[in-house]
A protein has these predicted regions:
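A charge-rich, low-complexity, intrinsically flexible signal that marks solvent-exposed coils, linkers
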Residues: 1-116
């Protein structure tokens, strides 16, 4: 099983999106999560650093500037999705990636406070 570390740049990006109210509170993550074609389209006009900002986890040992390096996507490359944070939290907890789980939890709490 892969191991992950928290992507601090992604956490900071998510916080900025929440502060700017760039979020979706009600969405079906299964329908809106970025698919491979959306990721490829994003990478055609954005840097790997910008791509990385949408992923809470960095795969330990994976090469930089590869999709394998980034895990736990939380938004649609435009806005953060509450359902995406819930999915990140759930998956990280399920596979015992505690640091990513806690980062997703903290962001979810922040989002809920700001959106209240």
């Amino acid at each position: 099983m892969a191991s992950y570390s928290v992507n601090d740049d992604a956490v900071a990006h998510a916080r900025k999106l929440i502060d700017a109210r760039q979020y979706v509170l009600d969405s079906d993550w299964g329908d809106v999560q970025p698919r491979a074609d959306a990721e490829n389209t994003f990478l055609e006009s954005h840097s790997w650093d910008e791509y990385a900002q949408w992923h809470l986890g960095l795969t330990d040992g994976a090469a930089d500037e590869t999709k394998a390096r980034y895990g736990f996507v939380y938004g649609d490359f435009r806005r953060i999705h509450r359902s995406g944070l819930i999915a990140c939290h759930y998956r990280a907890a399920e596979w015992r990636h505690k640091d990513v789980e806690l980062a997703a939890h903290d962001l979810l709490q922040l989002l809920d406070r700001k959106a209240a």
